[in-house]
Amino acid sequence: VAHASPWVAAAALFAIGLPLVPSQAQVQRLHDGLARTPPMGWNTWNKFGCNVSERLIKETADALVASGMRDAGYRYVVIDDCWQVYRDTAGVIVADPQRFPSGIRALADYVHAKGLLFGIYTDAGTNTCQGRPGTLQHEQQDARTYAAWGVDYVKEDWCNSRGLTAPDQYRKFHEALVATGRPIVLSICEWGSNRPWVWGPGTGHLWRTTGDIEDTWESMLRNLDLTAMHQAVAGPGGWNDPDMLEVGNGGMTDAEYRAHFALWAILAAPLMAGNDLRTMSDATREILTNREVIAVNQDSLGTQGWLAEQPAPGLQTWVKPLADGSRAVALLNRSGAEAELRADWTAIGVAPGRARVRDLWARADRGSFAGSYAVRVPSHAVVLVKITPAR
């Protein structure tokens, strides 16, 4: 949600073209059975901001099913800021009765009946980013309320938090959620401003690494670069979060949106759609439901990909190891002109010899290649391939 946050220093490695070599950090992530793969779903904020309602959520749940997104893996339907208006005399948080006349419990029941999961938003401070009541000093009460409503996912923001310590506040809310006995995913949203990659594992299931994404090529790449710096801490039970998807919101071309989606897949990032699912184009739906690309993101190995090579400014090879021994490789052209990019077996960790190459956006086998695979990539685009060593 909109805020002013201190920026983390941009990745100097990218500026000078050095690859990021992953390290094997010993990270204690949560082992509660939740978020064993990156969470997938939909959130109101990017498209609708404060314009949220019961009708929107029901129609979106319907669209998740009708579009094939639910069956492709999208499960969480999340209401972001502005659903809440005040606390009653007992301190219980109250949903806007005009926008949610049936109440949140009934809405969660509707979402659950569609085979989906239900999420909600709060803030660790006194008020949310849009001035609604925050959860400060009501952590246990709010956790109990959400559990009683049937909430499966909570995004917790960091506005109006002056004087608070992020690790302590998020840990307190995590413990309150655990105490309810209901399995609830906790999404930590403090924009990467308190080094959540250090304390987020073991506290939440995902943690934002950046400020809010905008629906532009430049913003998407900025969030990619900042998130790539923390590759070692991500894995089953805890994920770096470069923010929600902008696919389908109109600020980028379809080729740029394919790159956005492919790179979030390589990053093992949460895939939270942020567009209007009721009116999306066929091209948008095809991006969001490409099961071969989703499979890269949801791979059971749970390794976040990294920048393997940058042979020239703006030309990058990103790689993600997969559980079956293959590699997903994104050949990314950030430059202003079409260029040839090459996936070199040595750089991406594939044994010398022949390997099969499949183009995941084209859904086409490209053949068997020895040592490397080269392809021309348009400006502001990606070619995403799966490279499988010959057995």
Regions found by a protein language model. Name each.
Residues A259-A308:
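Catalytic cores of secreted or luminal carbohydrate-active enzymes
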Residues V8-P19:
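Bacterial N-terminal signal peptides
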Residues T60, L64-G163:
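Aromatic-lined carbohydrate-binding/catalytic grooves of carbohydrate-active enzymes
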Residues H138-Q141, V178, R182-D276:
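Glycan-recognition surfaces
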